[in-house]
Amino acid sequence: MDWQKITEKMCDFIQEKVKNSQSQGVVLGLSGGIDSALVATLCKRALKENVFALLMPTQISNKANLEDALRLCADLNLEYKIIEIQSILDAFIKQSENTTLVSLGNFAARIRMSLLYDYSALKNSLVIGTSNKSELLLGYGTIYGDLACAFNPIGSLYKSEIYALAKYLNLHENFIKKAPSADLWENQSDEADLGFSYAKIDEGLKALETNDEKLLRTLDPSLIAMLKNRMQKNAFKGKMPEILEI
């Protein structure tokens, strides 16, 4: 892939969305993971300024992720704010009848979304998305949580392509080497949740997208079954609510 042209196209897209909305800039959640780090880097290239990052850890968040996020803010000279969301999460735990790890992870994602949109209004800026194509196809995210945004410059790149672009843009090796994780709970791992590496997942997704029957026959049947199941089950996450026409 021509990463120079792709980078230019992404930066043009960011500039266009901000200009057409008459906004001042963008707001993003910076987790310390590769996706948000890449988006922050693209925003800085595209806008130079008016890029505001929110860092929103809980008490179980990986401290190394916060350190990496802070280093990136320093390297890019980004305006940022750290908001500890544990007290909000604790209030939910006291009231909710559903406190499974998945439920708490989803609620944490929606807390972060609420804060992002609060600062979006405060700063007259757009919330920019950080989900990649692999996550979007699988519905691997929280509806009205981390999937919520005004626009998304990286949603057409598979996770494996995210790594390639990150290397091209010289992101710190910490982002490239760390295991993919939404950091929703302690020691949470995307690949452990999904049961396969992103390399395998992307291979399967591409084969399904192009209907490459020859390649599909060579892949693990359990991988293809998992991908099809998640894509079908979570398809609603990528759609606007259906409205009855009268």
Swiss-Prot record:
Q: Give binding positions for ATP.
A: G29, L30, S31, G32, G33, I34, D35, S36, T130, K159, S181
Residues of the signal sequence?
none
This protein's record includes keyword Ribonucleoprotein: no
CDD domains membership? NAD_synthase
Q: Does the keyword Lipid biosynthesis apply?
A: no
Residues involved in deamido-NAD(+) binding: R110
InterPro entries assigned to the protein according to its UniProt record, in alphabetical order: NAD/GMP_synthase, NAD_synthase, NH(3)-dep_NAD(+)_synth, Rossmann-like_a/b/a_fold
State its Enzyme Commission number(s). Answer: 6.3.1.5
| GO MF annotation terms | ATP binding; glutaminase activity; metal ion binding; NAD+ synthase (glutamine-hydrolyzing) activity; NAD+ synthase activity
Instruction: Please give the GO cellular component terms listed in this UniProt entry.
Output: cytoplasm
Q: In which pathway does it act?
A: Cofactor biosynthesis; NAD(+) biosynthesis; NAD(+) from deamido-NAD(+) (ammonia route): step 1/1
Gene Ontology biological process: NAD biosynthetic process
Query: Could you tell me which Gene3D superfamilies the record lists for this protein?
Result: HUPs
Coiled-coil intervals, chain numbering: none
Reaction catalysed by this chain? Answer: deamido-NAD(+) + NH4(+) + ATP = AMP + diphosphate + NAD(+) + H(+)
The UniProt keyword set, sorted, is: ATP-binding, Ligase, Magnesium, Metal-binding, NAD, Nucleotide-binding
Q: Where does Mg(2+) bind?
A: D35, E135
Lineage, top-rank taxon, reads: Bacteria
Tell me, what does this protein do in biology? Catalyzes the ATP-dependent amidation of deamido-NAD to form NAD. Uses ammonia as a nitrogen source.
Query: What is annotated about its quaternary structure and interactions?
Result: Homodimer.
Q: So what family is this one in?
A: Belongs to the NAD synthetase family.
Q: PANTHER family, from UniProt? A: GLUTAMINE-DEPENDENT NAD(+) SYNTHETASE, NH 3 /GLUTAMINE-DEPENDENT NAD + SYNTHETASE
The protein, known as: NH(3)-dependent NAD(+) synthetase
Q: Which organism is it from?
A: Campylobacter jejuni subsp. jejuni serotype O:23/36 (strain 81-176)
